[in-house]
Amino acid sequence: MPNIIRKLVENDKKELKKLNKMALQVESFADEMEHLTDEQLKAKTPELKERIAKGESLDDLLYEAFAVCREAARRVLGLYPFHVQIMGGIVLHNGDVPEMRTGEGKTLTATMPVYLNALSGKGVHVVTVNEYLATRDMTEMGELYSWLGLTVGLNLNSKSPEEKREAYNCDITYSTSAELGFDYLRDNMVTRAEDMVQKPLNYALVDEVDSILVDEARTPLIISGQAESSSALYYRADQFTKTLKGQNLNVATSDYEEGDDYKIDLQSKTISLTEEGIDKAEKFFQIENLYDMENVALTHFVDNALRANFIMLHDIDYMVDENQEVLIIDQFTGRTMPGRRYSDGLHQAIEAKEAVPIQDESKTMASITIQNYFRMYKKLSGMTGTAKTEEEEFREIYNIQITPIPTNRPVQRLDHPDLLYPTLEAKFKAVIDDIKRRHAEGQPILIGTVAVETSELISKKLVEAKIPHEVLNAKNHFREAQIIMNAGQQGAVTIATNMAGRGTDIKLGPGVIDHADPEFRGLAVIGTERHESRRIDNQLRGRSGRQGDPGVSQFYLSLEDELMKRFGSERVSAFLDRMRISGEDAVIKSGLITRQIESSQKRVEGNNYDSRKQVLQYDDVIREQREVIYAQRQEVILTKEDMTPVLMGMFKRTIDRQVDGHELAGNLKDEETVKDLLQTVQNTMLPEEAIELSELTGLSGQAMKDLIFDKVKSRYASQMEKLADPERQLEFQRAVILRVVDNNWSEHIDALDQMRQSVGLRGYAQNNPIVEYQEESYKMYNNMIGAIEFEVTRLMMKAQIQPQTAIRQEAPRMTTTASQENITNVGPDTSVSEEISFENVGRNDPCPCGSGKKFKNCHGRTHIA
């Protein structure tokens, strides 16, 4: 055994020994707690809170608090946490992940660390994969926490801001990861402190932590606003792609065949036009060169149409519902994701392909990755039955250790080696034969599929075989709880995509474990192909054999499965040829085949990890910028102090930039240069009568800066006099700063998003895209800060203040990728109207509209014309 593996095993043993000792100490309180009356046990909560207030740490209280919660669970829920569950709870309190097998009672395990950490009063967030589980767990476990005197809240997408605030103010809050992330983003877009809902992030306990922190981490959370509509171009590009000759991803056997108009890279799932395809495109769109700079936008539409038509598969990647809406199917759970949309125009391209109404494109206004959101918590932990395969990722990205926890009872499930068939047809025939055999014995069967399409194919074959069954996929997920509840009954046959009831127990019915033959005892799990992630396969197996129950699992594979096509089918085919195995019904069991499949899965997992890492690397670049902007917004919203000192700094830096810019462009002794500077100052800072050419002529650069700054201070004082009330002055200052910061920040992150889409091409020039992105984003950030300060100065100086009128400022219409909701933020009761003059603006001056662009590249185009 290599030293590194031996060391890891020894570390696990040491950790388990330590946890075992701590769990015994918790159990030593059992008799004392059992003899307490209900009132005495409930009184332990305020007593423990008082001890925390006097300086004791949560670690000091762990043994007693766990024992209190354990005894309360016995009285309220009728459940008493086992020794191994106490061990798991200690790992969770330490901010790590206990790997506990399916059915080992993770929900009950979580109650002890949740109770202990909630005693601090700083808030605990229990995070689930969907709202159904959040509601269920809050209802079931909330009874325990309420009995112990703690408050429990539920945060759902449908809740109003007031209801959300109430939920977050509870000791314990149940929510989904997406809703937590979106609430954080929304809190940093409001204009009043009272509109914020979240408290500082303290402790998050994530259920199915691998699903949330790993699988969902590839998709950033985005709040967006509407951008320009380009429906006609999407339809035109779609018409073009439908004239092309080639293969779809699901039937492709090689990347490219002679005469094809496009080629597909099966491993990376990317697509590009061949020379023949490019010729067709140039004729179709009547252009000379598809890849000319002036055709960049068209190329973008064509690339999306290619992906939509030949890479994105109906009922696998997405489905169309009865409202003619394209819904994404989560590849890891099989559930649809209402409200989420593919970015960068791909979703619109799919809508064009399916001939359904095309929704407007969106513009990013705020975004954060799952990784960077959860890394903001002071303490983060989670539970799952399948995390060891992603141990490196948890350690590197979240600084979390994985500790395997022993099962309470030995696992009795029989896990058979994979069976490999040459064709899909042969594989499905074997699957149906196995189902018939097991169904005849009354054994409950769960058939796991990767895609909706496969589940419907098997359902059709079972109908032909006259075997009654239930189908659980993205099209009828609303019946999930009911279907899973009956899946363990004698003779039940259930077909399910990967969603197969994560977090829900398949309880075995009467007589299911009594069969004389071990092969037919308990739930039989049949996998119809390997998923690209070993964790998903392990989760499917884990549906059977829960809590020491008997069970059996068997995977059926074919050389035509997608995973086999992408990685390794040629090698396996060659192996079969050498073994002289042929024929439709030929089947092989081999350790070599299993190792080859696991090797393929590791490669896919490696690719997916790299993809998530890259998403994080890009988000890390703007993380510091986001934190600075959000922190400054918070200061502006929460401050009770006059912001004049802050504004004076902005005015001074803006004046310095203007004078320095004109000095670089020309000589300050030159009359034309001074005239240009005067025009800029009069257009953006001061009334014409406040400063004259003669005052600036002959001055040095520093003297000009000092003179203009003195006059700006006087102008500012007169503006503030119109708002005699200090409170209204602060409202006005706050309204201007927030409006300018929000406009510029949303423009900035949208520009960064667009740059990220294109910066990858710089790799062809031997440049590191991440480094290029860092450098460009830093320059853009500095430009944004300059634009913010310029625009704040302009608005403060030029705004026509109407002191008697109070008009609420409303935020723009926005959309989240998970909720498609409108968010209206109400701002200060201050009216700001502005009169912008484009007269006498120098060509190279900043445009008075506040875009940050030069006048000649903005409003100057139309004004000069």
Curated annotation (Swiss-Prot):
Q: How is the cofactor bound?
A: May bind 1 zinc ion per subunit.
Residues annotated as binding Zn(2+) are 847, 849, 858-859
User: Which prosthetic group or cofactor does it need?
Assistant: Zn(2+)
Q: Which domain of life is it from?
A: Bacteria
Task: State whether keyword S-adenosyl-L-methionine applies.
Answer: no
Q: What does this protein do?
A: Part of the Sec protein translocase complex. Interacts with the SecYEG preprotein conducting channel. Has a central role in coupling the hydrolysis of ATP to the transfer of proteins into and across the cell membrane, serving as an ATP-driven molecular motor driving the stepwise translocation of polypeptide chains across the membrane.
Q: What is this protein called?
A: Protein translocase subunit SecA
Q: What organism does this protein naturally occur in?
A: Lactococcus lactis subsp. cremoris (strain MG1363)
Which gene is this protein's source?
A: secA
